[in-house]
Amino acid sequence: MDIETPPTEARRYGLGLVNLASPRMGTKIHSVSDDFFAEAPRMLQDTIPVFVPDKFDDNGKWMDGWESSRRRQGGHDWCIISLGEPGVIKLVDINTAHFTGNYPPGAMVEVGYSLDGDINKVEWHTLIEHVNLGPDAHHLLESKYLSTVNLVRLNIFPDGGVARLRLFGDVQRDWANQKNDIFELSALRSGGSILGYNDAHYGDVNALLSEGRGLTMGDGWETRRRREPGNDWIVVQLGTSGFVDEIEIDTAHFKGNFPDKCSICLLYTSDAADEGLGVDLGGRRI
């Protein structure tokens, strides 16, 4: 399982952004106009899109993404996505990897918010205006609407295929109305995020903050083998400030490459960006 990491441009855009479209967040396809050639949920997968030359199914060529049939009656195709957690989307990546003669020439992204999930009552706002798309490429686009949303509608013109859709942003959880007394403050779904690290050569660094146990050795944070003095580090921003009562460090599936030991430091700051990142970040060692 090869997990896709954000393009370099996305990482430079802002530390701490998470992919709100990830199934890890509980995000699902709500509805779709047409996914005859390739089912829409594939578009949200965390894995790197692949091309398998000799793979076909009952409807034709198998593609790793969402692909609609060819339109003959005008109009355009769309896909509505229900976010697992409400959030503010700051950057969108429409990836047409491996779609060369069947990519959509254009796309537009709209967003909305619904308390009851009734699509018919949603007021849609433009997140990304109509843009031209190219074949087999990332299309990184800055958001035009920076308010909390939980529904996203990807419109493609007129039809075609999208390998992956990434919605980078911040989780917006209403902590004032939570019923539980204990929370996993570092979880992605709680608004936790990775602010920085010295190395993440293998695996998926965001899996470190995902719910449940890792599925394989690739479903976690792993650094390259260190040949020089020092140690590896990662900085996590919690979803909200709080008191840490218990910490779990799970090395599931890491057998010959688990860390010998670790240490954890805590820090309270109103702006992590002002503190800098790295082993000298400071804080209280626990």
Where on the chain are the PLM-derived regions?
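Short, surface-exposed beta-strand/strand-loop-strand elements in extracellular ectodomains
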Residues: 103-111, 259-266
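Disordered, acidic Ser/Thr/Pro-rich linker "stalks" and the adjacent N-terminal cap
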Residues: 1-78, 82, 100, 168-239, ...
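Beta-sandwich interaction modules
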Residues: 128-160
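Hydrophobic alpha-helical segments, chiefly the membrane-spanning helices
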Residues: 280-286
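Short loop/turn segments immediately following beta-strands, especially the blade-tip
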Residues: 114-117
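Conserved small/polar residues in nucleotide/adenosyl-binding loops
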Residues: 268-273
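Edge beta-strands of jelly-roll/beta-sandwich modules across compartments, strongly enriched
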Residues: 160-170
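A short beta-strand element within beta-rich, extracytoplasmic domains
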Residues: 88-98, 154, 244-253
